[in-house]
């Protein structure tokens, strides 16, 4: 789609240019899922010449609706357990709007692409003396 990495902010801005409500239904197995079908759908839409803004909105609509379903299912399975969103996806405007008050969001400075993963990998590398 021609957006820079990390892509979170750019994808958010691109998707905001579209009012598409299209999404792909991702299958859930308990609290597990795979996004490979979504990836294929995104590629196919781009190959068909669907505008990048509509493809971005499609991808975000799909992921946000999936996260909502998984979160609601987890909250039913574990009532009263708080849910905290952090990392790159947690800074997405559509997700924040959709999830509203039912979850907690980390501050934007803690919600950057791969922040948690990079921190964990760095700690492990330090512990092993690799850096």
Model-derived segments and spans:
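Acidic, glycine-enriched active-site microenvironments
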Residues: 1-131
